[in-house]
Amino acid sequence: IAKYLFVVIIFMGIISSLSLLVMASNKSDAEAINISGSLRMQSYRLLTEMERSPNTVEQNLVRYQDSLNANVLLTVQNQLFAPSGIKASYQKILQRWMMMSDFARAHQIEKYHAELKSYVQDVDDFVLELQRFAEKKWIIAVSVLCISMLLILAMVSYVIWYMKREVVKPLELMTKASMQVQ
């Protein structure tokens, strides 16, 4: 009986560890979605800055570059199970941004404006990929937890059945026999 209970405890420990790992990675997903979503607004703001106050463009480019290279976005790229679509989307944004930042530095407002809608669509695609990945991880986590709970329930049910068969019934028989002897 002790062996079975020990297996249940080990199994619960493994499940808890896996769940914590998945939940920890989901925490960074929300931050990645927020930062990548802010890239859209920042790129539009940069266009406005180019038109109204060109002397602040370089400062805004640095801020944008910091957001684009945020640690959480780089971490998503290196996650073991990150889909190739996320990685490709991020690389596409990085490549496109090189061109967009060149337009901004050269104050080529028309070229920047002409590419902006397409660039923002690429950012939207990246955000959508991040959201889908986060949703998949959440579904996997919930599925693993449900299956694990069912397995634990099955193991505990087996232990209870085993105890009834191997411990309770023999004790009942011994009690009956001792009552008959008395």
Regions found by a protein language model. Give the residues of each.
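Extreme N-terminal signal-anchor transmembrane helix of membrane signaling/transducer proteins, especially
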Residues: I1-M23
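Alpha-helical transmembrane segments of integral membrane proteins
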Residues: V8-S16, L145-V156, I160
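Cytosolic-side ends of inner-membrane transmembrane helices, especially those
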Residues: S19-N26, I152-V168
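Juxtamembrane membrane-water interface segments immediately C-terminal to a transmembrane helix
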Residues: V22-L47, E58, V62
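Interfacial "cap-and-anchor" motif at the non-cytosolic start of specific transmembrane alpha-helices
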Residues: A30, W138-S148, K169
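Extracytoplasmic
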Residues: I33, S38, Q42-E49, A88-I140
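Extracytoplasmic ligand-binding sensor domains of the Cache superfamily
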Residues: E49-F103
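Membrane-proximal alpha-helical signal-transduction linkers
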Residues: E166-Q182
